[in-house]
C-alpha cells in the first residue's frame, strides 16, 4: 500500500475502536442502572468509613457515583449512656505498667510543656493524662521560675495516656493552677481553679464548654484534687479545700450532673486536715484517700454516698504512708485522729480491698525519693502492721512526687469489676536539682491477677539542660 492508503487504513481502524469503546461504555452504564434499580439502591453506592486520627475519630460519609466521590464530614457520634461505675474494685495481686510518658527526656529536644500535677482519668473509650502546664516549654527561657505553684500562665491540658505532654497532641481543657477531671460516660467534665489567692474561682467545663462556677468561700487558695474526680450513674463527685495549709481549713464535697452543680455539703472534720484527695468508685460509693498537710502522717479517709452523706476519719493501718513521717515501728495507727505530728505532706492514694488496703508511699521517710506500694492486711479497718506484699515502682535513688488513683471502667476492660490503677509523678528540677525550672513525668500502673516484680521506672532525664547552663 502507498502511504495514503496506510493512513486511511490506520484511521479507519482507530475510528472503529473508538466507536466500539463508546458502545461498550453505553452498554456498561445501561447494565449498571438496571442492576442497581433491581437491587433497590438507585444510582448511588453509599458507604461509611471510620478513620482514627490521634485521639479524634472522624466519620466520613462517602457517596460514589460512577467515577466521582463526594465526601461529607459528619459530627462524631456521642455516647448515649452514662457509665454505671457501681461495680466493686477488682482484687489486685500486683500492679503492671500501663504507660510512661518520658516527657522530660523527650523535652530536652522536643516541644514539651513544663508541667506538674499529672494524673490519669478514663472514659468508656480511652484514658487520658491530664496536667497543669506553666505556659512554657522545657529547655526554653520561659521555663525560668516555674517552681511557682500559681500563676496566670498555668493551663490545664491533656493528651492520650502514654503520650508526652507535647505541643502537637495536647488538648486545652481550662485555665487553671489546680484541677480535676472525669468522664460520666457521655462527656468529659473538668474543674479548673484560677485567679488570685483570696478570690479564686473554679470553672466547671462539660464537653469543653464552661457551664458553672464555684467562687472561693474562705478566701484562702481554693483548690481541688489534682487527680480524677468520680462519676457514678451520671453524677460526678469531687472534693475541694479552702483555707490554710498548716491548720484548720474548710472542706466541701460537690456533686454535678452534665457539668452543673446539683449538690454540695461541708465536711465537718475538726482537728483534721484534708487536701488533694485521690478518689475512686467502689460498690456505688466514692472512696477517697487524702493528704493531711497540718499534722498527720496517716492519711485522711473520706467515703461519700450518692446522697452526699459521708464518713470521714483516717486510714486505720499501723503503718504511716505520708511524707515526711517517722519510723514504722514507732507508729501505732488511728482510725479517727491524726498521728505523727509532722507538718507538710504529699498527695498520695490507697485502695480498699475488703478490710485490706493497698497504700502507696515514698520509700524515703523524709523526702520525695523512691516509691512503693504495700498491701496491709486489715489496714482499712484496724491498726494493723501486717504488711503482706510490697512492690517497688521507683527506687530510693530517684525522685518521685505526687501519686493518685483512678479506675479502668468495665466498658474498657469487659470485666465485672473496676480495675484499680495509680500513677506516680516524678518531679525534676528545682528545688532539689540545679536548674531554672521544675517539671515532671509519670509512670502509670494497673492492678492485675498476678504478682509483679519490683523495678525502678524512674524519670531518667540527664540534667542540667542547655538552658540551665546559660
Swiss-Prot record:
Q: Where are the transmembrane segments?
A: 15-35
Q: How is it modified after translation?
A: N-glycosylated.
Q: Where does substrate bind?
A: 116, 150, 275-276, 291, 368
Q: Which species is listed as the source?
A: Influenza A virus (strain A/Equine/New Market/1979 H3N8)
Topology relative to the membrane, per the entry? Single-pass type II membrane protein
Supply the domain comment: Intact N-terminus is essential for virion morphogenesis. Possesses two apical sorting signals, one in the ectodomain, which is likely to be a glycan, and the other in the transmembrane domain. The transmembrane domain also plays a role in lipid raft association.
Listed cofactors:
Ca(2+)
Q: What is this protein called?
A: Neuraminidase
- Superkingdom of this entry's organism? Viruses
Q: Name one GO biological process term.
A: carbohydrate metabolic process
Regulation of this protein's activity per its record: Inhibited by the neuraminidase inhibitors zanamivir (Relenza) and oseltamivir (Tamiflu). These drugs interfere with the release of progeny virus from infected cells and are effective against all influenza strains. Resistance to neuraminidase inhibitors is quite rare.
Q: Where is this region: Head of neuraminidase?
A: 89-470
Q: Which reaction does it catalyse?
A: Hydrolysis of alpha-(2->3)-, alpha-(2->6)-, alpha-(2->8)- glycosidic linkages of terminal sialic acid residues in oligosaccharides, glycoproteins, glycolipids, colominic acid and synthetic substrates
Record topological domains on the Virion surface side: 36-470
> Catalytic positions?
149, 402
Keywords from UniProt, A to Z, are: Calcium, Disulfide bond, Glycoprotein, Glycosidase, Host cell membrane, Host membrane, Hydrolase, Membrane, Metal-binding, Signal-anchor, Transmembrane, Transmembrane helix, Virion
Q: Which pairs of positions does the record mark as disulfide bonds?
A: 90-417, 122-127, 182-229, 231-236, 277-290, 279-288, 316-335, 421-446
Region listing for Involved in apical transport and lipid raft association, in residue ranges: 11-32
Sorted alphabetically, which Gene3D superfamilies does this protein's record hold? 2.120.10.10
List other remarks. The influenza A genome consist of 8 RNA segments. Genetic variation of hemagglutinin and/or neuraminidase genes results in the emergence of new influenza strains. The mechanism of variation can be the result of point mutations or the result of genetic reassortment between segments of two different strains.
Q: Which residues lie on this side of the membrane: Intravirion?
A: 1-14
EC nos:
3.2.1.18
Q: Per its database record, what is this protein's job?
A: Catalyzes the removal of terminal sialic acid residues from viral and cellular glycoconjugates. Cleaves off the terminal sialic acids on the glycosylated HA during virus budding to facilitate virus release. Additionally helps virus spread through the circulation by further removing sialic acids from the cell surface. These cleavages prevent self-aggregation and ensure the efficient spread of the progeny virus from cell to cell. Otherwise, infection would be limited to one round of replication.
- Give the main location: virion
Amino acid at each position: 500500500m502507498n502511504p495514503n492508503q496506510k493512513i486511511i487504513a490506520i484511521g479507519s481502524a482507530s475510528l472503529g475502536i473508538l466507536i466500539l469503546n463508546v458502545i461498550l461504555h453505553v452498554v456498561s452504564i445501561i447494565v449498571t442502572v438496571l442492576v442497581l434499580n433491581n437491587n433497590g439502591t438507585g444510582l448511588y453506592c453509599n458507604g461509611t468509613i471510620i478513620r482514627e486520627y490521634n485521639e479524634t475519630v472522624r466519620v466520613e460519609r462517602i457517596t460514589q457515583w460512577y467515577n466521582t466521590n463526594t465526601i461529607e464530614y459528619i459530627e462524631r457520634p456521642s455516647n448515649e449512656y452514662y457509665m454505671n461505675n457501681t461495680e466493686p474494685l477488682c482484687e489486685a495481686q500486683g500492679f503492671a505498667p500501663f504507660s510512661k510518658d518520658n516527657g522530660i527526656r523527650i523535652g530536652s529536644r522536643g516541644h514539651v510543656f513544663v508541667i506538674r500535677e499529672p494524673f490519669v482519668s478514663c472514659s468508656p473509650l480511652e484514658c487520658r493524662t491530664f496536667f497543669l502546664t506553666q505556659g512554657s516549654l522545657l529547655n526554653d527561657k520561659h521555663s525560668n521560675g516555674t517552681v511557682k505553684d500559681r500563676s496566670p500562665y498555668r493551663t490545664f491540658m491533656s493528651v492520650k495516656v502514654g503520650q508526652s505532654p507535647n505541643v502537637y497532641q495536647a488538648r486545652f481543657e481550662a485555665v487553671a493552677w489546680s484541677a480535676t477531671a472525669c468522664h460520666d460516660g457521655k462527656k468529659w467534665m473538668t474543674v479548673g481553679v484560677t485567679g488570685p489567692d483570696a478570690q479564686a474561682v473554679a470553672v466547671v467545663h462539660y464537653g469543653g464548654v464552661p457551664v458553672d462556677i464555684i467562687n472561693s468561700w474562705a478566701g484562702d487558695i481554693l483548690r481541688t484534687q489534682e487527680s480524677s474526680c468520680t462519676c457514678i450513674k451520671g453524677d460526678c463527685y469531687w472534693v475541694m479545700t479552702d483555707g490554710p495549709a498548716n491548720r484548720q481549713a474548710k472542706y466541701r464535697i460537690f456533686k454535678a450532673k452534665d457539668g452543673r452543680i446539683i449538690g454540695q455539703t461541708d465536711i465537718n472534720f475538726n482537728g483534721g486536715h484534708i487536701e488533694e484527695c485521690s478518689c475512686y468508685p467502689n460498690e456505688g460509693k466514692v472512696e477517697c484517700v487524702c493528704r493531711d498537710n497540718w499534722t498527720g502522717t496517716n492519711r485522711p479517709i473520706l467515703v461519700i454516698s450518692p446522697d452526699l452523706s459521708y464518713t470521714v476519719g483516717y486510714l486505720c493501718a499501723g503503718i504511716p504512708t505520708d511524707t515526711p513521717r517517722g519510723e514504722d515501728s514507732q507508729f501505732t495507727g488511728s482510725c479517727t485522729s491524726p498521728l505523727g505530728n509532722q507538718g507538710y505532706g504529699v498527695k498520695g492514694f490507697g485502695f480498699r480491698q475488703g478490710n485490706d488496703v493497698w497504700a502507696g508511699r515514698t520509700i524515703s521517710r523524709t523526702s520525695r525519693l523512691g516509691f512503693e506500694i504495700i498491701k496491709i492486711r486489715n489496714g482499712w479497718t484496724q491498726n494493723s502492721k501486717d504488711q503482706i506484699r510490697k512492690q517497688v515502682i521507683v527506687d530510693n535513688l530517684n525522685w518521685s512526687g505526687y501519686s493518685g488513683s483512678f479506675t479502668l471502667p468495665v466498658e474498657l476492660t469487659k470485666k465485672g469489676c473496676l480495675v484499680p490503677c495509680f500513677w506516680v509523678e516524678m518531679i525534676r528540677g528545682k528545688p532539689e536539682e540545679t536548674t531554672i525550672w521544675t517539671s515532671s513525668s509519670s509512670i502509670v500502673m494497673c492492678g492485675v491477677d498476678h504478682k509483679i516484680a519490683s523495678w525502678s521506672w524512674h524519670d531518667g532525664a540527664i540534667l542540667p539542660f542547655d538552658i540551665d547552663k546559660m
